[in-house]
């Protein structure tokens, strides 16, 4: 039974109902419908913290989905799971892949900046200020790109950029 039929969350149920209606009225191929079902089930599992199940659904959606824009969101969500699991190198890889398909994903750029900033803080704790500065500089570049795409967002990042004199 698809996950969307067993989920008890009201918002997920509402999303599933609306998505099913749209899939019936918008012309789509059976492959597109199947890819979306896996994507939707992946989001549902992810929201419940069932990351292994979410990844299985996302990988299956990737196998079926051909549209680069839609694939970018699948890749982004896979990156989120790896970030949550502390697998930052894998997460960065998936965020990069998402951005290759859709360069207008400020949330991917923000998450990449957060990972770089975290690595900079780790380097400081290890006493390596040179490496820390390199990570902070990289974080700044990603945040600047995210802010350029959505100027009203990422206020904390904007403040950090100003405080550290990295804002242009």
UniProtKB/Swiss-Prot annotation:
Keywords for the protein's UniProt record, in alphabetical order: Chloroplast, Membrane, Photosynthesis, Plastid, Repeat, Thylakoid, TPR repeat
Main location class: plastid
Disulfide bonds, paired cysteine numbers: none
Location of this chain's protein in the cell: Plastid, Chloroplast thylakoid membrane
Segments annotated as TPR repeats: 35-68, 72-105, 120-153
Keyword Plastid: yes
Membrane disposition: Peripheral membrane protein
Domain of life: Eukaryota
Record GO cellular component, one term: chloroplast thylakoid membrane
Record GO biological process: photosynthesis
Keyword Amino-acid biosynthesis (UniProt): no
UniProt similarity note: Belongs to the Ycf3 family.
Protein role: Essential for the assembly of the photosystem I (PSI) complex. May act as a chaperone-like factor to guide the assembly of the PSI subunits.
HAMAP family noted in UniProt: Ycf3 (MF_00439)
Name the record gives this protein: Photosystem I assembly protein Ycf3
Annotated source species: Pelargonium hortorum
């Amino acid at each position: 039974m698809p996950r969307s039929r067993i989920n008890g969350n009201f918002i997920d149920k509402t999303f599933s109902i609306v998505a099913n209606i749209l899939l019936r009225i918008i012309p789509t191929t059976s492959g597109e419908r199947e890819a979306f079902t896996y994507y939707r089930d992946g989001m549902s599992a992810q929201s419940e913290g069932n990351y292994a199940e979410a990844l299985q659904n996302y990988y299956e959606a990737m196998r079926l989905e051909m549209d680069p824009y839609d694939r970018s969101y699948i890749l982004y969500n896979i990156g989120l799971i790896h970030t949550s699991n502390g697998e930052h190198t894998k997460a960065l890889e998936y965020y990069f892949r998402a951005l290759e398909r859709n360069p207008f994903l400020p949330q991917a750029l923000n998450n990449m900046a957060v990972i770089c900033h975290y690595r900079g803080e780790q380097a400081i704790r290890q006493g390596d200020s040179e490496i820390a500065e390199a990570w902070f500089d990289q974080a700044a570049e990603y945040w600047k790109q995210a802010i350029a795409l959505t100027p009203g967002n990422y206020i904390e990042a904007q403040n950090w950029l100003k405080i550290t004199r990295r804002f242009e």
